[in-house]
């Protein structure tokens, strides 16, 4: 009888996750489950969660890279919401994508309107041209 787990049926190999097959870190299975539970469509194709997961992973990596650069510029080793805000608002495409998103504790971009800045003094070489 070969009903139990014996050495005779050990030709089975360990299962490989869809995330590993696609070379992703984010969970494809979880995204697939959330797509099914979310009632976005009656049927979900097998490639849709892989594609969506890869897009989400790319966006997360892009934002985290820019936020890490902002943290390093501020001589910090930990990313805080302010760094996320600076990273997103200084990048044209991410700002367009996340323009209506409010980041808690993010603050605002430093910006002083030109009319509020002190007037520049005239150069000495351009003396008065009075007659």
From Swiss-Prot:
Residues with the N5-methylglutamine modification: 105
GO molecular function: DNA binding; protein heterodimerization activity; structural constituent of chromatin
Keyword DNA damage attributed: yes
Name the record gives this protein: Histone H2A.2
GO biological process, one term: DNA repair
UniProt-listed PANTHER family: HISTONE H2A
Subcellular location: Nucleus; Chromosome
Keyword set includes DNA-binding: yes
Source organism of the structure: Candida albicans (strain SC5314 / ATCC MYA-2876) (Yeast)
SUPFAM superfamilies per the UniProt record, alphabetical: Histone-fold
